[in-house]
Amino acid sequence: MPQSATKPFIDVLSGQRQAIPPMWMMRQAGRYLPEYREVRAKAGGFLDLCFNPELAAEVTLQPIRRFGFDAAIIFSDILVIPYALGRSVRFEVGEGPRLEPLDDPAKVATLAPRADFGKLAPVFDALKIVRGALDPKTALIGFCGAPWTVATYMVAGHGTPDQAPARMMAYRHPDAFAKIIDVLVDNSIEYLLAQLAAGANALQIFDTWAGVLPPAEFARWSVEPTRRIVEGVRAKVPDAKIIGFPRGAGAQLPGYVEATGVNGVSIDWTAEPAFIRERVQSRVAVQGNLDPLVLITGGAALDRAVDNVLANFAQGRFIFNLGHGIQPETPIAHVEQMLKRVRG
């Protein structure tokens, strides 16, 4: 893993507050950028772009060139692990991902225990290209989906509003569901370690659907698998910097931070600021949490919202980000407005 002492983003995750918070945006390589749309059209399908090292590196670097963010995040997807496990994964235009559902114990019995990491070599090649092209002060983030969130897609075969198929399977067939989680934990550890070896300076674990789980299930299916991943990565890379993003976890965030051992936690725009300052930011770095819709809105509403986020969190260890991914219809001028406001 490259040295990172001069990177403001890594410094915050190491416990050092920065006078001007480092910043990046979830989904910063995306459809709001005309240069991204051009490369995406050239690539063909979404997975074709993910698995073309030169093009994936190019779209990873585009927002860094345009905005000078403090961190790049490799262009990929949380569903590349199911793909490498031999599951059918495809992305339909306007519909999102489609997978072959693992919706009963007999189907789960067919799940391969180990991914074919040769299928993911293009991701590691893209990381190497990006790391070589980045300024030494700019961090490079690798990532994976948390086992719970990846499992929700694997069980249902597609995204659902409340993740009912995965929740029902975890209640009805907990042993079979635990097998899916165990396979994802083991392969996520290996995948994240390979990303560090390829040049990533930090890692983020995206648990987009953590917030749909009741407390006992949140502990079992979100917290514990994430803890095992963090422990597994740190067994090989003790100083690995890891951010967790259990979206919608709310009052369960302090327990998540304590149990998982993450260096930082990403929060969505619904998080209560005083609670986060006292119970979370007092222990780890906080990343977030501008509402992506106010970034679309722009104007005085955006200025007020940015000022509010800074007033809430910038006195502690803080990374400025959105509370979730940037929306495709976001005007570039509003991203520039946000940048100027944060950086003064």
From Swiss-Prot:
Entry-linked PROSITE patterns: UROD_1, UROD_2
Key word Transmembrane helix present: no
Domain of life: Bacteria
Compartmental location: Cytoplasm
Listed Pfam families: URO-D
GO biological process, one term: protoporphyrinogen IX biosynthetic process from glutamate
UniProt-recorded Gene Ontology molecular function terms: uroporphyrinogen decarboxylase activity
EC category: lyase
Catalytic reaction annotation: uroporphyrinogen III + 4 H(+) = coproporphyrinogen III + 4 CO2
PANTHER family in the record: METHYLTETRAHYDROFOLATE:HOMOCYSTEINE METHYLTRANSFERASE RELATED, UROPORPHYRINOGEN DECARBOXYLASE
UniProt-recorded name of the protein: Uroporphyrinogen decarboxylase
UniProt source species: Bradyrhizobium diazoefficiens (strain JCM 10833 / BCRC 13528 / IAM 13628 / NBRC 14792 / USDA 110)
